[in-house]
Amino acid sequence: MKRMLRLALTLCLLASAGHCAAQAIVRKSFARAERQTALLDSLLTAPDLFPASWNPDGTIKTNTARGWISGFFPADIWLLYEYTRDTKWLDMARRRTAPLDALRRYTKTHDLGFMVGCPCHLAYRLTGDDHYKQLLIDASDALLTRFSPTVGLIRSWDNKGGDPNPYRVIIDNMMNLEMLFTASRLTGDKRYHDIAVRHADNTLKNHFRPDNSSFHIVCYDAGTGRVTGQKGGQGHSAASAWSRGQSWGLYGFTMCYRETGDKRYLDRAVKSA
């Protein structure tokens, strides 16, 4: 009996030590994130600029609110506020999210989930401020203008001259469906949910090869919805897997399973992994 008690005590101590070590890693990681975020904020020379990458000379490369990654930096700041509850991050998050108001009715991109949905969902969840809720809903309405009932998918890029063909859809679009599911929950309007599901279903049908890798781009005929081409895009070739695209599909279909409970989506996520 004493042996069992000693063994149990030893296991408890080891588990406690492991938990403490993990917590120390988390604290260290967030401390570094705070330093890096404060530095990035100080390098932005205007309130409506967002960090993009770095120039060869070591200076920061920035983008405007219309850049597809504009929502990432504000979202990171909201996450810092959630972890630390330090109001300096709350103030910065509000300030860096404010320029995204300009995207409220912007219909020229499929990336509104990245740009608006990501930071505004966090902002609304953490503050309860209806301004962020409405901004997310308005951006969702803008995204729906890019949906074709004939094709059954949200168009990615527009063509020069307004030519309807090819109707191009990229695997990245799966990431933007999360905003539509959120809008459906916030409004009770099933339209957002149904369009997200239809887009996911057609992506499931046409975007994957037999080896479970995904095409970056699938082209459709806007008038018939027929597939006219499947391309590698940012991958090495039309026949290769593109790692970032695989991750878009992996996250996107996992999220769709969470939102719908449809096991087909979970199966696709597992196969993508």
Question: Where are these predicted regions, by residue range?
Answer:
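Bacterial Sec-dependent N-terminal signal peptides
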Residues: 1-24
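Glycan-recognition and catalytic cores of secretory/periplasmic carbohydrate-active enzymes
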Residues: 22-273
